[in-house]
Amino acid sequence: MPDITREGIMLALSFHCAIRQKHPDCDHLYKIDSTQWCFIGILVIYVSANILSDEGHAMSLSANSDAVSYASVTGVKTAAETGDRIEWVKLSLAFLPLATPVSDAKVLTGRQKPLTEVAIIIAEIRSRDGFEGVGFSYSKRAGGQGIYAHAKEIADNLLGEDPNDIDKIYSKLLWAGASVGRSGMAVQAISPIDIALWDMKARRAGLPLAKLLGAHRDSVQCYNTSGGFLHTPLDQVLKNVALSRESGIGGIKLKVGQPNTAEDIRRLTAVREALGEDFPLMVDANQQWDRETAIRMGRKMEAFNLIWIEEPLDAYDVEGHAQLAAALDTPIATGEMLTSFREHEQLILGNASDFVQPDAPRVGGISPFLKIMDLAAKHGRKLAPHFAMEVHLHLAAAYPLEPWLEHFEWLNPLFNEQLELRDGRMWVSDRHGLGFTLSEQARKWTQLSCEFGKYAG
């Protein structure tokens, strides 16, 4: 007889006896020999043991919920092992010439020279898995060379990092340049890199960035600034206003802040009459009023049904802006000159404006911009990002309160693609990421460039 368990033998004998007592006439069952009965018994024991084991396991989970157990997992790779890696980074410094020198109130008060060009700092990033991203920062007048130089100093820290770990990379770049702080050129050098990483992230997902962020809308109401600068004669301003409306713009912003405040009122009156009573109109003083002038001009401008009065005071005068916002019915907008999340935090928590106007390239990229958006939304502020509509369209589309987008055609020659303006709104395209690629003209305007890693395209 084979070596079988005692339990199997006893169980087999029990079955054998029970069957003979219950069915004495079933001779065919009696012909099963003892070994076969024992195998049957062992099979029953095996099945029963597994059932009891499962029940016991369930009972132990219930009865011993304070006990710990650790599953042994094999053959599974971690995210760190399978993640993508940054293999190549290119930085470029280009200078975009302006056809006509631009003057606002800062020029007329002698604080700045007319603007003749815009420095553009570009980051192009490629990953091991073949994904690419493009981002940019900028500077008007001085600063472009410094932003590019600092970006060049810290860019090699990107190599080998997973491009999806945007927050980790941002922190690493901040610490690489910790000696120069966390605002101003220090973060403006990170901006093109951070924007490029978000562009890559959305491209990888196969989505426009607005959709990746969770868009609240597919288009954003849009206003024009470039037609209303102080260097532009009033008759040309009125022609620009008419052309903008014909092109589908949703609002007009007029520059103010001249030493002769009566001239501001004269130009504003003419533009309001040309637009009609209800067409959206804004004014921008570019920080050129003191508190007394700001309240006096603000009261005079109440009659013009303005969407907002922008930068009536120095950008860092949080208290003065708060007093003005509380005193006027016309909303106050400010924030474009601030260069960090912390500065915007002071503005928002200080109730200094009705509209916040962060600029992603200036505050350090999309990552800090999203934090500003979140804080502003929690405090009920409206959003009107400054400049860089190619980036801000996506961010504004993801803001919970209806925002405004600033239309500036200056950067159009840099990109192969253009944004659609229709029915007073700028529309998010179905192109993945930010939805733009660099033009040959952008390459021709490039004066400096550097590369890190190896391009494997």
Language-model features: where?
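Active-site mouth loops of central-metabolism enzymes
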Residues: 221-236, 286
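Alpha/beta enzyme core
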Residues: 238-247, 297-303
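Positively charged N-terminal leader segments that act as targeting/secretion signals
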Residues: 2, 6-8, 12-13, 34-35
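Metal- or metallocofactor-binding catalytic centers and their adjacent structured scaffolds
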Residues: 73, 88-92, 125-204
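Catalytic core of soluble alpha/beta enzymes
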Residues: 254-386
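Flexible C-terminal active-site loop/helix
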Residues: 61-72, 81-89, 96-101, 114-115, ...
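Conserved, mostly hydrophobic/aromatic
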Residues: 130, 193, 206, 284, ...
